[in-house]
């Protein structure tokens, strides 16, 4: 069973970077900080499935002004999954996605995502999705790690959102940890 501890960081957190297209990452970068929830239950993970794109992603999103990471995780879990956040464990790792900036004066736009181990309440209520989440057909569900990873790998073979590569690499890291006995979510 994955354990929750007050430790602020997982023993060996992952650190992954992605560059989408021609991007100058050593110039002025505008950063957007996001949080993502890794919620294990038995042999499964709580993920959000896009019925439009077919991919799976971890619940999460941007941190609003004045929000702590904990508050942002709670808001995103309720919006996307109808889940009540009960506990935040350690930081499992982070990703950085760079793409060309659209804003004047910046060379790159970076989405920095922090992945936290989370525990939720037993009951899910109706999600409260944002309009874009409704357009993408977001639907929460419990998925086996191997199944989720294979689903996203299949999606990567065709046109898919840029975030699919990020989520696939994180799922692959969790699978490696699981195989090494580090992330035993069962």
Regions found by a protein language model. Give the residues of each.
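Active-site segment of metal-dependent pyrophosphate-handling enzymes
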Residues: 83-124
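Acidic, metal-coordinating catalytic segment for phosphate/diphosphate chemistry
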Residues: 2-36
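Short, well-ordered beta-strand micro-motif
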Residues: 39, 117-119, 141-144
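Conserved Nudix-box catalytic region and its N-terminal flanking loop in Nudix hydrolases
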Residues: 40, 44-83
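Short, P/G- and charge-enriched loop/turn segments at secondary-structure junctions
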Residues: 20-27, 101-106, 129
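Short connector loops at helix/strand junctions that flank enzyme active sites
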Residues: 32, 40, 53, 58, ...
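Nudix hydrolase/Nudix homology domain
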Residues: 54-55, 125-186
């Amino acid at each position: 069973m994955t354990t929750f501890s007050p430790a602020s960081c997982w023993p060996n957190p992952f650190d992954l970077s992605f560059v989408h297209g021609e991007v100058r990452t050593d110039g002025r970068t505008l950063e957007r900080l996001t949080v993502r929830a890794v919620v294990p239950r038995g042999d499964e993970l709580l993920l959000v499935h896009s019925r439009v794109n077919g991919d799976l992603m971890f619940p999460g999103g941007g941190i609003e002004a004045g929000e702590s990471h904990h508050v942002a995780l709670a808001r995103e879990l309720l919006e996307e999954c109808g889940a009540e956040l009960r506990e935040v464990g350690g930081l499992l790792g982070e990703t950085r996605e760079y793409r060309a900036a659209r804003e004047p004066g910046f060379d790159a736009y970076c989405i920095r995502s922090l992945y936290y181990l989370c525990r939720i309440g037993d009951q899910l209520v109706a999600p409260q999705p944002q309009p874009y989440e409704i357009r993408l057909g977001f639907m929460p569900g419990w998925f086996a790690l191997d199944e989720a990873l294979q689903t996203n790998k299949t999606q990567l073979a065709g046109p898919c959102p840029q975030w699919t590569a990020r989520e696939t690499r994180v799922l692959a890291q969790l699978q490696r940890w699981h195989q090494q006995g580090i992330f035993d979510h069962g």
